[in-house]
Amino acid sequence: MEAHEDLEDVPVTTRAPRRSKAARSMLAAVLGACVLGPAVARADDPPRRPLPDYAGRPPPPPTPGQDLLWVPRVIFSPVYFTTEFLIRRPIGALEIAAERANIPNTLYNFFTFGPEHKSGIVPIAFVDFGVNPSLGVYAFWDDAFFKGDNLRMHFVGWPDEWLGGSIVQRIVFPSKDSLQLKLLGIRRPDQPFFGIGPSTLQSSLSRYGIDKVDGSATFDFPMWRASKVEAGVGVHYAEFYDGHYHSDPGIEEEARTGAFALPDGYPGGYTAEYNHLLFALDSRRPFPEEGSGVRLDAQATQGNGIASSPASGWLRWQGSAGGFLDVDGHRRVVSLSLQTLFADPLGSGPIPFTELVSLGGDVAPMPGFYQGRLIDRSAAVATLRYRWPVGPFIDGSMQAALGNVFGEHLEGFEPGLLRFSGAIGLESDSSPDSNFQLLVGFGTETFDHGGQIDSFRLSFGISNGL
């Protein structure tokens, strides 16, 4: 039951979809991650011929945005040289060699089916250091039973450790409105838990297991530019148990040391019906137009415990605002966003700990931390981000975030309790269901505790939609 949407992960930052080429773009991302690499190399490109001065006039002066580019270039020059010469160029050289050998077309024709290549089965893998990796398959079928009916399936896991899968049916109507039906299930024993509150320590790392089933129906109504309204309903079941991962202690063992108390909802789990509503006002235009604009959004998820005693319910709600500046008109976008998140009980029963506000991981703000690293009743995060195109359907991203979780309605907020999260990586934007990702990130302790780096994340591969 994911209650929030990342300000960056909205359709306006993606390439305009082409139904006849959906399979090609998805497979290109997979092959780029698993075989060829995601970037298009420029190292071996022939030198460009100078443009003749046909008009007899000097070139136009640089724009203010182009003048401002030197600031992030100087600040992030060490990161740039690392990604450019250790990642992009070597991988790009491999891609050029593979294209000369016609490997991409051979693999594309092997993994996709039908005269228009509207269906296919593709192997995927994802590694996120700190949890078990995943291997599996991603299957797609566009216009499956009628035009606009698109099916997506993921089946992933790791031998003797975990297993998960999802099935999505997305129906796109002629008006561009859509209905998504989704069913997912997962069983894995390696979920991290550090306690609840803003001052939890990395040294309190423990593991719990989860069995989860979720079914939902979501309506999406695009509006002006990238604005939209989204509404959905669903049913969620979760059961928890003592977990394991390598030598890390289980949640029950760590709780016995006094590091934290066992959280609400553990180990009994819960079953809940939930309702979700999102409204986003976004002035940005779709690709390939420039990416400047403003986004405001508000969203809420209300959950109701089923057959729970005492009666339980909760409301997760959040608001966010972001400004985006395309510094040169070519999708090199600097953005600043502010986000607040809250979770409130609606009954006499407590909120299950997995329904509290959470920071960390790939979806929530502050990706330099593990998923679920920071949990409590509310959170506030400010994020500065720079995103730029690297190759076809591939963007680079650098971000710095400042924030933390707090008590009810930001109770206990103090500047000294803030943490820093930094991340850099590559990510594809060719599909809403499975994307290539390469991320290197880190997070710190609270400033009152010294602000030292105590969390490191490295992940790469094809996301599995779970």
What are these regions (language model features)?
Residues 421-444:
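A short, conserved beta-to-alpha structural element at the edge of catalytic cores
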Residues 1-22:
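N-terminal secretory signal peptides that target proteins for export/translocation
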Residues 43-182, 228-232, 240-244, 254-291, ...:
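Outer-membrane beta-barrel initiation region
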Residues 114-123, 131, 153, 206, ...:
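C-terminal outer-membrane beta-barrel translocator/porin domains of Gram-negative envelope proteins
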Residues 179-221, 340-359, 436-457:
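Outer-membrane beta-barrel translocator/channel fold
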Residues 25-37:
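Bacterial N-terminal signal peptides
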Residues 214, 218-222, 226-236:
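Internal, well-ordered alpha/beta segment that forms a basic, Gly-enriched binding/recognition surface
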